[in-house]
Amino acid sequence: MSRLHNYGLFQLIFAVSLGAWLTGCATATVATSDIGVLDPQLPIIPLATPFPIRTIETLDKKTNKRIETDVLAMKSSEIRKRLTTYESFTTIQKRDTSGGLTYIGNSAKIGKGTYIITFDYVNSTVQEISFNGRAKPALGQIGVGLRITAEVTTLTNDVEIGGLIPLGIAFNDRKVNGNLRFKAFGLSNDKVASLIPVDKQVLDVSGIQKAFEAAATVRLLIGLDETTLEPHLIGVTGVSVSESQSALDAAKSKLSKSP
């Protein structure tokens, strides 16, 4: 497929395919000043793979207190009412020469290298997670949605890769190459397998468009009565990178226990 030469066309694809998701949706970003900080606090530290949880907080109407309820005992309509926030999270990690990954901020242009970019489009809520005797708990981000993972190699310096549109523009300008992977999580519907790409997609105009279409599709499927929902732990917020693994472990332990 030929490369696009018009930013306006990317905007059109974005508006048509993903507008339904992002209307009223909060997007998590990182300030430029966080770039290069040894231990930044990012909007979210995602799990490598979203993890199915066993319990979710609900309100006991008899006692007017929050209790842990087994998600399998809840109807999908009840779960849907708990996942009240539509959000998109973007996190970027840089791969070093030894294969290790380091989190960086996502609102500034970056230099040559290989990067893993995680885009989470989710219906979600949060639950407090206590860990390591910390006075202020972390927040476990739980929900259902779509994860798009881009593995990108930048071919020049000063490339913006903190979003699907910037990635498409960078591809158009021959500044990046790479691939995209898709994972719908926390929802069961016969249409998922046929509408969400299973195979790795090349990072090109077609791949970017499929990403938008997949996000819009999942957003619609979440709202359908016939879709079964099972919330997953997506990641943790309110912690620094150095604390994140302890917080993630505590979240997995708490949310996988029987109520």
Residue ranges: model-predicted function:
Residues 11-21:
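Bacterial N-terminal signal peptides
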Residues 2-13:
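Bacterial N-terminal signal peptides that target proteins for export
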